[in-house]
From Swiss-Prot:
Name of the molecule in the record: Protein dml1
GO CC list: mitochondrion
Any Pfam family matching the protein: Misat_Tub_SegII
Disulfide cross-links: none
SUPFAM superfamilies: Tubulin nucleotide-binding domain-like
Subcellular location: Mitochondrion
Family: Belongs to the misato family.
Lineage: Eukaryota, Fungi, Dikarya, Ascomycota, Pezizomycotina
Length: 493
């Protein structure tokens, strides 16, 4: 068994992770059904509920601010014990004055799930929190509310990178967060494979996650750490954008060298398609679109017969850890195969010696860049995952496309469009399925991105921190420039 422990840090991260967990739950099979190719034990843990029944809950720790959990309770129906109404007042004989915050009303969707009834269709009006479309029970240890800050507070906003850094330091000093929150899940694993971390990178959660990753690397040594770093893509004032860029610069400088995979994700993406319908102001919508790519590209980590995800990411030299997330989507047309707009090799593989720059795929959705960079970028390494299109149906074409590339085992299950997804997001989708080509790509575009952050850091950040940060970003940038300007050097590897 190769288990993965997940950490979810903040509101935007929890919107994305909730879609991820709902999709994992949709793969469950029950008595009499064919065994799923997905190994559920990778992300889920067995346990025992309060009444002695067996439970199966996500192996995750969910952090968020006060007021951000909506109607999600720490103790749910699986783990709560019925309170004894006849309990006395103990040693206190005086009057009690109980002050309670007005409870958040449960949505009709959650009420129907609890009652075992068909759930109504979700809308942007009915989804107020990420918990409004959550379909799973979590272990009480998974729910960690940080009471020092309140969601969307105007008095104490959780925006500055240093605020998150200081909050982690204070909490870790008081509670030892790894020992309290992570170790119980890690010690249950037969063989811990990786730690997956969802976070935002352009606000205070960037500082919080940076210090968390420091502790994780110290504690778990060479274990893989995969970071999905979400950043705002909506237009904001110049001052706000500069603050976000400073936060992003600090986050990528602090986390990317410590991680095995660091993927910046723009939410919402800058460019979309006419066949993709979503509300860019709804985090429920935008993270559903992101999850279609993120969940698909990590599918190999959950398959019973696939164990090469890390080696595929590492490529030839293992030096490139910052990856772009990209995808193309078509509707599942019930058997009439649609070709996705891709050029070059279609295998699930890392870039080969045959010339990575010549085997670029043209993706419809780019979740990492805004399209302003160079179109003539060089690919150092790429992992592609197909869902819903059986390439072996056209064996002659596949044989030609695979020349020079190692073949990997393929699974062709379409990506599910679950009930908690926004309806009609993908035009023409049938049977609640879509075909997806998703990819993680390490390319020279990263150098352009970091160069922009270097410029911002050099102009705005204080003198005490400026030299260290700018030089550190420069070293990261150089690793995405060196070695590709001369094609013969690459092909001689």
């Amino acid at each position: 068994m190769h288990e993965i422990v997940t950490l979810q840090l903040g509101q935007r991260a929890n919107y994305l992770a909730t879609h991820f967990w709902n999709l994992q739950e949709s793969y469950f099979t029950y008595n009499g059904e064919e065994e799923s190719p997905v190994d559920h034990d990778v992300h889920f843990r067995p346990g025992v509920g309060a009444d002695g029944t067996e439970t199966f809950t996500p192996r995750t720790v969910i952090y968020d601010l006060k007021g951000a959990f909506g109607t999600l309770r720490k103790y749910n129906a699986l783990y709560e014990l019925t309170e004894d109404a006849n309990l006395g007042q103990g040693l206190w004989d005086g009057k009690e004055v109980i002050q309670q915050q007005t409870p958040i009303s449960q949505s009709d969707y959650q009420k129907n799930l609890d009652a075992g009834l068909p759930a109504p269709k979700l809308t942007t009006e009915t989804v107020r929190y990420w918990s409004d479309y959550n379909r799973l029970f979590y272990h009480p240890r998974s729910i960690v509310q940080l009471n020092d800050y309140e969601l969307n507070s105007m008095i104490m906003p959780f925006e500055d990178w240093s605020v998150g850094e200081d909050l982690f330091s204070d909490l870790d000093k008081e509670h030892d967060l790894l020992d309290r929150d992570v170790r119980p899940f890690a010690e249950e694993c037969d063989q811990l494979r990786a730690i997956q971390l969802f976070t935002s990178s352009d606000d205070a959660w960037g500082g919080f996650s940076a210090r968390y990753v420091d502790r994780l690397r110290d504690e778990f040594g060479k274990k893989s750490i995969w970071v999905w770093a979400i950043e705002g893509g909506s237009r904001v004032s110049r001052q706000t954008q500069l603050k976000r860029d400073m936060n992003k610069a600090r986050t990528i400088y602090s986390i990317s060298p410590q991680s095995s995979l660091y993927t910046p994700i723009i939410d919402p993406p800058s460019h979309t398609l006419s066949k993709v319908h979503f509300d860019p102001h709804s985090e429920w919508h935008t993270t559903a679109l992101i999850s279609s790519a993120m969940e698909s590209v990590t599918l190999p980590t959950r398959l019973r017969q696939f164990h090469d995800f890390e080696s595929s990411l590492a490529g030839d030299d293992g030096t490139h850890k910052i990856f772009e997330l990209q995808s193309s989507v078509t509707a599942d047309d019930g058997g009439n195969r649609q070709h996705l707009p891709v050029k070059g090799p279609l295998t699930e593989t890392n870039a080969s010696e045959q010339g990575a720059a010549k085997s670029q795929a043209k993706f419809e959705l780019d979740f990492t860049y805004d399209g302003r960079g160079s179109s003539n970028s060089h690919i150092f390494n790429q992992l592609q995952v197909w869902r819903g299109t059986n390439l072996d149906q056209d064996k002659g074409s596949v044989a030609q496309e695979d020349i020079g590339l190692s073949r990997k085992q393929r699974y062709y299950n379409s990506a599910p469009m679950f009930q908690s997804y926004p309806s009609h997001m993908f035009s023409g989708a049938k049977q609640n399925k879509i075909n997806v080509l998703a990819a993680l790509t390490a390319s020279s575009r990263t150098a352009e991105r970091i160069k922009v952050l270097e410029t911002v850091a050099g102009r705005i950040i204080g003198v005490d921190e400026r030299e260290t940060l700018v030089n550190g970003l420069g070293e990261i940038r150089e690793s995405y420039e060196t070695g590709w300007s001369n094609d013969s050097d690459f092909n001689d590897i």
